[in-house]
Structures are given as structure tokens and as C-alpha cells.
């Protein structure tokens, strides 16, 4: 336990703790030039992702906290691990994001978290952060935020209007694997927020059509100049009406963040004001699966990804080759580079591309008789 940490000490801990979430493509790389050129790469939280038009964008990638009530066997932040714990306040995340943005280090924020106290408490802290960013700091950059399985639907609904993308990690391919490695998590709890987000996006598309607002949902880019009036002080008169048992949370917002809108507990869960000015999760949702922690085949993995695309309208499924950070002898070990090969992860991404962009079915790429890709061959072969 380390007390009175500086914000930079927290950044070092919480950016490193976020590096195993591959929903953004790269992070944790530090490289200093030798004096013969210009430019240094810092490892603290800067990762690179790609927009729908192919641009590479830099994101501040951090956890709100690495404290966690769960004890997932594959996770470095599990409750039983003796690691230094740190927690950002919402204001600290906002300050870091704005300072990095002003210096042109980043174009947006990727915000995830360990589960502190409960899913609802964690989701509330994440929500406080993005409301502050959008309202108090008038931040118009890209925000990707995790939706926490087990959190209330109302919190996820509100968050969807403040962020560009949300993601819910599937974690492991099967319910049996979850029971074995993450017994506190269930498939139903993970799929429920995915369905909430999907339904919210569909409902919002209909709302936007009825109000004749032209939003290009495929790219997540607003073809009307929607950002011009999102964050003005008129938001203080907006009203978000919804049911939630934790009235103190919303009363807290009424007093501290009135610029972002007021919350009350009446009128059939309708959300007005901010939602009329911005679409719901405009860049869509994504998910992530760990590859190789259990014995699922590539065929099983691409079949699950195909189902997520078709049944939940996901924009991306990410694959993360398992790294045995806890050196658990009952799980695949990485010793001298052996273990789950990164090339397997790469082949899954290539197959995923064929499904997303060229309409291939999982059954056209693999079968139960031939369930795995040849790591030496591109799936197109």
C-alpha cells in the first residue's frame, strides 16, 4: 500500500495496468532516439488506434483504478495479487486528458477500470469522469469507455450519450471457461450490456431519422456540425428523467455538475436534452476475447466472433494472445517466448477481416474437421 501518490505515479501504474486490454491496438512502448533524429516515444498510457477512414489516432489509455473485487486467474489486477494499487479521481483523469490533448499528444481517451466496491459504483465513477470531460472541460475529442457488466441499465444509457464508443469484454470464449478462470463473471452478465448498447443504438437511429438529423453512424463521424452546440451552458437546463434507486448519486450531480444537466427519478426512464444533441455511442461497440488461456479452437473463436457481429452488431472483435502474467502453472506458460504464439492472434485478425469486409462465414474458413489455422499461412491461402 502506497499512500499520497502523485498523479504521475498513478499514471505509471494505471497505464501499465491497462496494457493488456487490446481494444486499442498498441501501448506500452518506450523508445528514445540516440541523438541522430527527433522524437521520443513514451510508454505512459499513449496507445494507437485506427479510425474508420484509416487514420492512426493516439489515445490516452488508462484504468480509473486497478483495485478489483474479482479474482480472475488470468488478470494481473486480481484481488489476491500483491501489487501496488492506485485510483484516479474523475478530476485527475480530466486534467490528464486535457493536458495531453493541449500538447497534441492525444486525440482522445480510452478509459477502463477494475471493479471497485461494485459494478454500479465503478460505472458511476466512469460516468462522472466523462460527464466532467464533456461539460466542465468542453472536451470534444474521442472517448472510448468500458461498460461494466452488472451495472444498471440506466447508468449505461446515460454514458452512451457522452462517449463515442463503448466496449464490453467477452473475456473468454465459453461459459465453462469463465467458471474455471473468472468464477465471479457470467456470460449473461457480459452479454446483457452488449444488448443494452445495441438496443440504444438502434433506438437512437430511429430517433435521428424521425428528427431528420443526418449522422454517419458507420464512421462515427457527424455530418452535421453536431459538436458546435453540445457543450454550451444551455445544458444546465437539460433534464434527464430516469428511474434509479441511488438518488444520492443524481443529487450529487445536481449540485456539482449542473452544467451537464439535471437528473431526476420520474417520467418513465426518458432521457432528454443532451441526447437530442448527440447520438448514442456513435462509433459503435466492440469486444475482446483472450486467445489460448483455455483450449478452444480457432474455429470456435471465429464462430463466436461471427455471432457477435451478427447478433449484437459489433464494430470490432479484438483478440488478445494469452500472457501468463501470474505464472499460474495450471495455465499456458510463456517461457523464453514459448506459449500462446502471437502469430495465432495475427491469423485470427486476418480471418476476422475476411468476415467483416468480404462477407466470409466462419464455416468457409474453418470446420470441425480442420479447426485451426496454419500459423505459417495467411487464411486467404
Regions found by a protein language model. Name each.
Residues 1-67:
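Flexible, acidic/Gly-rich N-terminal and inter-domain linker regions that tether
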Residues 60-63, 91-102, 273:
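Short, charged beta->alpha transition segments
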Residues 62-91:
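Canonical Radical SAM [4Fe-4S] cluster-binding loop centered on the CxxxCxxC motif
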Residues 75, 108-111, 166-168, 317:
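Hydrophobic residues within beta-strands of alpha/beta enzymes
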Residues 77-83, 110-119, 143, 178:
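Short acidic, glycine/Ser/Thr-rich loop/turn "cap" segments at secondary-structure junctions
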Residues 96-112, 351:
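Short Fe-S-cluster ligation motifs
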Residues 117-354, 358:
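Conserved AdoMet/S-adenosylmethionine-binding subsite of the radical SAM
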Residues 366-381:
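Conserved alpha/beta core segments of nucleic-acid transaction machinery
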Amino acid at each position: 500500500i502506497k499512500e499520497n501518490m502523485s498523479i504521475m505515479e498513478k499514471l505509471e501504474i494505471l497505464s501499465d495496468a491497462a496494457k493488456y486490454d487490446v481494444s486499442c491496438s498498441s501501448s506500452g512502448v518506450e523508445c528514445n532516439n540516440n541523438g541522430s533524429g527527433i522524437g521520443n516515444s513514451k510508454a505512459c498510457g499513449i496507445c494507437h488506434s485506427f479510425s474508420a477512414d484509416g487514420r492512426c489516432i493516439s489515445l490516452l489509455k488508462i484504468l480509473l483504478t486497478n483495485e478489483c473485487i474479482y479474482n480472475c486467474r488470468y488478470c494481473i489486477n486480481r484481488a489476491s495479487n500483491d501489487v501496488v494499487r492506485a485510483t484516479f479521481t474523475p478530476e485527475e483523469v480530466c486534467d490528464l486528458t486535457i493536458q495531453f490533448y493541449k500538447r497534441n499528444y492525444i486525440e482522445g481517451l480510452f478509459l477502463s477500470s477494475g471493479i471497485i466496491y461494485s459494478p454500479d459504483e465503478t460505472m458511476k465513477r466512469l460516468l462522472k469522469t466523462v460527464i466532467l470531460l464533456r461539460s466542465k472541460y468542453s472536451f470534444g475529442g474521442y472517448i472510448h469507455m468500458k461498460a461494466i457488466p452488472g451495472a444498471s441499465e440506466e447508468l449505461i444509457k446515460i454514458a452512451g450519450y457522452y462517449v463515442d464508443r463503448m466496449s464490453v469484454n467477452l473475456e473468454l470464449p465459453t461459459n465453462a471457461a469463465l467458471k474455471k478462470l473468472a468464477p465471479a463473471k457470467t456470460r449473461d452478465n457480459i452479454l446483457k450490456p452488449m444488448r443494452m448498447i445495441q438496443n440504444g443504438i438502434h433506438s437512437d437511429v430511429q430517433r435521428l431519422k424521425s428528427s431528420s438529423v443526418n449522422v454517419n453512424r458507420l464512421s462515427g463521424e457527424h455530418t452535421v456540425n453536431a459538436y458546435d452546440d453540445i457543450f454550451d451552458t444551455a445544458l444546465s437546463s437539460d433534464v434527464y428523467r430516469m428511474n434509479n434507486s441511488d438518488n444520492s448519486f443524481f443529487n450529487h450531480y445536481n449540485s456539482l455538475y449542473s452544467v451537464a444537466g439535471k437528473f431526476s427519478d420520474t417520467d418513465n426512464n426518458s432521457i432528454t436534452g443532451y441526447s437530442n444533441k448527440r447520438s448514442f455511442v456513435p462509433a459503435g461497440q466492440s469486444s475482446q476475447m483472450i486467445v489460448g488461456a483455455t483450449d478452444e479452437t480457432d474455429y470456435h473463436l471465429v464462430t463466436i466472433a461471427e455471432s457477435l457481429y451478427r447478433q449484437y452488431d459489433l464494430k470490432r472483435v479484438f483478440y488478445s494472445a494469452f500472457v501468463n502474467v501470474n505464472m499460474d502453472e495450471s495455465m499456458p506458460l510463456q517461457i523464453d517466448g514459448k506459449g500462446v504464439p502471437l502469430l495465432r492472434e495475427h491469423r485470427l485478425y486476418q480471418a476476422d477481416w475476411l468476415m467483416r469486409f468480404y462477407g466470409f462465414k466462419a464455416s468457409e474458413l474453418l470446420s470441425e474437421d480442420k479447426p485451426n489455422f496454419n500459423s505459417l499461412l495467411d487464411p486467404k491461402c
